[in-house]
Each structure stands twice: as C-alpha cells, then as structure tokens.
C-alpha cells in the first residue's frame, strides 16, 4: 500500500479512486492532481513508480489542504461561528441543522433519538 498524506491508499483500485481515500480529495480534485503529475488516471496504485509517488506527494502537500490541516481548519471555522454567535453558530451550539433544513418532522440524526413526552398515556379502548 502506498502512503500519501499519512493515509494508506488501496493498491488494487484506479489511482483516481485511490486518491479519494484522502480526506479533502474528491473525484474531481483527484483527476486534477493526476493531470498535474502527468500520470494516467486509469493506472492502478500498485503500478506507480517511486518517482510518480513522490511527485503526487509533492503536489498534494504544496497545493492542497488535506487530512489534519483541513479538519483543523473546519473545526476552527465552526468554533469561530459559535464564538461570534451568528445564526449558523447558534444552530451548531443547539445541535440543530445548520443549512436551513426542516426540523418539524426530520433531522433525527442531528437532533438525536426521539424522546417520549413524560406523563402522556395512551388512551385505553
């Protein structure tokens, strides 16, 4: 397994698919990186030479934010929004959907498991 941005990428998959295992790289960015490195997108990761691996690593490290750096930036952005108490920050604090989704009947994943109302009994027939 080749290691890029401290992630083991799978050997038996195409390079474009393998690069998407790195947090922050999607299919479009992976294709762009392959073009910059002048490596075929259809090449398997196990077929890469050491020189090609080094060029991939250099391109990713110099031009893109991935893995830990990107996670840290996202976390800091959310913390900043919470600190300035903007609308999105308040939604994060209250653990509600941030981007305008409905919450009346949905958003169970974000809100957590449904809690029954205490004291309410079902009618006996």
From Swiss-Prot:
GO terms for cellular component: cytosol; small ribosomal subunit. One of its GO terms (biological process) is translation. PROSITE patterns: RIBOSOMAL_S13_1 (PS00646), RIBOSOMAL_S13_2 (PS50159). The keyword rRNA-binding applies. InterPro entries: Rbsml_uS13_C, Ribosomal_uS13, Ribosomal_uS13-like_H2TH, Ribosomal_uS13_bac-type, Ribosomal_uS13_CS. It holds the Pfam family Ribosomal_S13. One of its GO terms (molecular function) is structural constituent of ribosome. It comes from the Bacteria. Keywords: Ribonucleoprotein, Ribosomal protein, RNA-binding, rRNA-binding, tRNA-binding. PANTHER family: 30S RIBOSOMAL PROTEIN S13/40S RIBOSOMAL PROTEIN S18, SMALL RIBOSOMAL SUBUNIT PROTEIN US13M. Belongs to the universal ribosomal protein uS13 family. Part of the 30S ribosomal subunit. Forms a loose heterodimer with protein S19. Forms two bridges to the 50S subunit in the 70S ribosome. Located at the top of the head of the 30S subunit, it contacts several helices of the 16S rRNA. In the 70S ribosome it contacts the 23S rRNA (bridge B1a) and protein L5 of the 50S subunit (bridge B1b), connecting the 2 subunits; these bridges are implicated in subunit movement. Contacts the tRNAs in the A and P-sites. NCBIfam families: uS13_bact (TIGR03631). This is Small ribosomal subunit protein uS13. It comes from Rickettsia akari (strain Hartford). The gene is rpsM.
